[in-house]
Amino acid sequence: MSPRGQFEGKSNEFITIVITIIIAVSGVSGALIGSLFRPNQSADSFVDEPFGDPLPIRFESQPFADYEEYETDFTLNVSSYDINSDLSNIINLDSFSYLPENARNAIVDHYFFAVPSNFKMFADIYCMNDDYELPSFVTSDSVLHAYHVLYDLALREIEETHFMNHIGNLSRHMVNVSLDQYNLLESDLWRALAKKNAAFFSVAAKLHDPDWTVPDPVTGWVYQTLHFIENAGGFTTDWFMNQRLDFSQFIPRGHYTRTESLKRFFKTIMWLSRVAFRVQPDDDGLTAEQNAERAENETGQAVLLCRAFEQPSHLFIDGETPLRLWRELYDTTSFFVSTSDDLTVDEYLTIFNAIYDDPVNIVELCNRTKLGTFIATARESRSPQIISGWVWDSQSINVTKGLRFMGQRFVPDSYMFSELTHAAVKYRMMPKALDVMAVLGSQRAWDLLDDQKDYLNYTTQMNRLKETYGDLNLSNWTQSLYWSWLYSFKTLLDEPELGHPSFMLTDQWIDKQLTTCLGTWTELRHDTILYAKQSYSQTYGASYPPPGYVEPVPKFYAKLASLCRMMLQGLDSRGLVVDDFTERLVRLHDLLREFQVISEKELSQTPLNATEWSLLENIGGILAHIEGTYNEGGRAALVADVHTDPMSGKVLEEATGNPMVILVAVPNEEDKVFLARGAMYSHYEFAWPMSERLTDEAWWQMLEEESAPSMDDWMGSFVLGISETSDLSASHNAYNDPEMRRNSSSKAYRNVMPIAIDVRKMAKPT
């Protein structure tokens, strides 16, 4: 299986779907696909498959915004330095007299260390530096976190001020038109399909507005389904479309727990994105003939849905507004995240308009031969790439192919997970975040995955993914904000060369950067939890120190600044600009450009000017302004489930905790060494029951109660206080052990609560 067509080199068209369906002409027009009717059945019952040849269709779209990368210009010229065993060559040691022996040893050995803290926000650490007149070490973590805050805020603002109304009006319009179709159609079969559409959109309308009155014809279906959504218990087929749907996905999480409005929006979009109108299902317990009939029924619903977009209702008297609203929502979220992994409304409308000459004509709309052509054409369209539901390892992913009204998006990390778990990698049911980092180029991540390499086909699959993603060009990597975020931070996985500061040339710094990438990736998954398509395993001295030091990664700052510019231009082009947010994003963009220049000077041993020193002196207040208030930015700690294993009923949770304090021995312009203090991510990975998918609030409580899992043991190379043997490594391996998985009472299989580590007092100056 190859990755999405986004890999084919089309210039940064994040919503581009350019697909040419190549049709093999059989030489016999109207080839028999299957008998239209069963013998002795009424003409209102679909059976087998109707006649029809697929049509050649081309789908195109336009880019939302362009990406243009800032250039960097520097020469690596930093002299190496060592730390005296008694730290006597650190010119501001008096400011850190509280450091215990293990912290001092870490500075001597590898120039820096990190410790957990009780700080709730990154900016708090830098503001305390200002208060205590301590030099700030400006980390890549701090600006990545600032970008996350603004990305999340922008998405939240747009959802509440624009999309909440859009999706409500669109759902109610589709209910009204579907009921009109139900009353107008003469065929009992097609009336039943219109009724199911009315129920489908009534669920969405009721989730959006609890006070909305459900129409009488579909009341029973709708309230039964709402019961499953509210209980969020897991997989069931006991609802009106009889698909096996994972209702645990309806637990609001991410930023969608902030307000009741966002909770309702989350459930509404989740409903519209998870249910498929499939073209070739293979459902359990059904014969091939029955599955073919189900494909025809669901595709018939899709045909009526396409027609409904152009029908008037009392909400929209024209035939253009519904599709315009859908496109505004879809295109904007595609800009933030990615294009749909499943076939979209636009793609189905293209097929619909190519097949039906007069869609207003009900007789033609119900034409069985045209429906057969529709099914054949849709089956020849692009396939999904990410398994996101219950699929047996003996089945093709194409059993999920079909229309989803607001399909979840193809994101590369979910694709990596789907290609590195069962059935692509036999019996590996849970992936690891390190999988993503290894594919993105981290040799250290690959080394840390040694215990996974015994899985059959794991190394082969990993090498294939490395080659695939290694061949991507700039246009591929910058097709959306999500992709560009990955592109920006993967620069940090490059191993530093001679000429970088000594602290960057240590093995421990490579671990620090890997932790940074895991932290920002977790924030990315948290922010897009509603839209990103989640993967599923298939079943089965006397001198005074300078005011600060910028982590010298100029290429990273250039890429993140370019991403900010792309985001600004994309939102402005759609009139989605919020004044306060825009001002803060512009400030982050400008700050990143300044950090790029400062880090280029640091690497080239060029003195900073007074303006640049002033910037570092005030970095706490600047970052605090960008992050916003506690209510806007929230606690830095967050959690997101990124993969589901239906067999064990577990999800893989990725989380960041409170920001850690990092102390680094850095050089000044006079080749002297001083300690600078900054903030960095903490990162956690653990399995959790799918019926209890964690919210941020539940995760915060675990942190407060010190019942959170421990960080992975390899982070102990630079984080003081991590135990020698991580509970996570043992429990993660247990989840992937078939014998252990069958014995859920096994100690290693249960979620392990770590011991509390009392090192946080070191994070605060005395």
For the regions a language model picked out, list residue spans one by one.
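Secretory targeting signatures
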Residues: 1-39
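Long, non-catalytic protein-protein interaction scaffolds
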Residues: 39-765
